[in-house]
Design a protein with these regions (language model features):
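Short, structured coil segments at secondary-structure junctions
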Residues: 68, 97, 115, 132-134
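Active-site neighborhood of HAD-like aspartate-dependent phosphohydrolases
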Residues: 1-45, 132
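Short, acidic loop-to-helix structural element flanking the phosphoryl-transfer center
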Residues: 32, 46-74, 81-86
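A short, structured active-site edge motif that brings together acidic residues
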Residues: 73-83, 89, 95-112
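Acidic, Mg2+-coordinating phosphoryl-transfer loop and its flanking beta/alpha structural elements
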Residues: 118-151
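Conserved Lys-Pro-Asp/Glu-containing loop-to-beta segment of HAD-superfamily phosphomonoesterases
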Residues: 4, 103-130
Length: 156
């Protein structure tokens, strides 16, 4: 079976929480709880090049180096509005030149997969939607754990 490997961006390759905390002055979940989701996204959207300026996750290159021979695709969810896609595409080009990136609403990630495809993602919210189409979902906690889990599906 031919499988495609998809890597989520925020929380797997890009350190969303670190970048967001620098803008918000609080950890993202704390800011959202205190000020609401609308203000959370409005503040990030108004920050110049928020997504483009995100740092790499500390172990992002460890994960990527282990799977680059599989030609992974970055499959990343977008917030509402039309402000983030270009920033994410430029971020991927800077950190992972030549790697294909697909930007979509998180709930629609499964529309880009076929049965057997593997997604490494830190957010389990849409796990069921991915698995409904026959995809394999690996919850990312660290590069080491994800690499170990991927060995069941790919030669690493």
């Amino acid at each position: 079976m031919s499988r495609q490997l998809y890597l989520d961006c925020d929380g797997v390759l890009a350190d969303f929480d670190k970048g967001a905390q620098a803008i918000l002055g609080l950890p993202p979940r704390a800011f959202e709880k205190r000020h609401g989701l609308g203000r959370f996204w409005a503040k990030l959207a108004s920050a110049p090049d928020f997504y483009f300026s995100l740092p790499l996750m500390p172990d992002a290159m460890e994960l990527y180096d282990a799977v680059k021979h599989l030609n992974p695709v970055i499959l990343t969810g977008l917030p509402r509005g039309n402000w983030a896609a270009d920033q994410k595409v430029r971020w991927a080009a800077q950190h992972f030149p030549g790697v294909r990136i697909i930007t979509t609403m998180a709930k629609d990630k499964r529309n880009h997969a076929k049965s057997g495809d593997v997604l490494v993602d830190d957010q389990v919210r849409h796990r069921d939607r991915w698995e409904e189409i026959g995809g394999v979902f690996i919850q990312h906690r660290s590069a080491a754990e994800s690499i170990e889990a991927l060995k069941a599906y790919f030669p690493l």
